[in-house]
């Protein structure tokens, strides 16, 4: 009976660590979701976003 108890405890510990590593997995809503466009202007506007305020890419040095 002692070996069975130890076996059950070890099995429970292994299952709990497996669930912790896997997490809850991908939900169907997450997989089918369309990624949002967080940069609608494209990469040029992403890197040159300093132009938006004054129209000058070198903002501190533009008169």
From Swiss-Prot:
The modification Cysteine amide is found at residue 62. Pfam families: Conotoxin. The keyword Thylakoid does not apply. The cysteine framework is C-C. GO terms for cellular component: extracellular region. The lineage of its organism: Eukaryota, Metazoa, Spiralia, Lophotrochozoa, Mollusca. The modification D-tryptophan is found at residue 58. Residues 24-54 form a propeptide. Its target is unknown, but this toxin may modulate voltage-activated calcium channels (Cav) or calcium-dependent potassium channels (KCa). This is Contryphan-Lt2. Disulfide bonds join 56-62. One of its GO terms (molecular function) is ion channel inhibitor activity. Expressed by the venom duct. Residues 1-23 form the signal peptide.
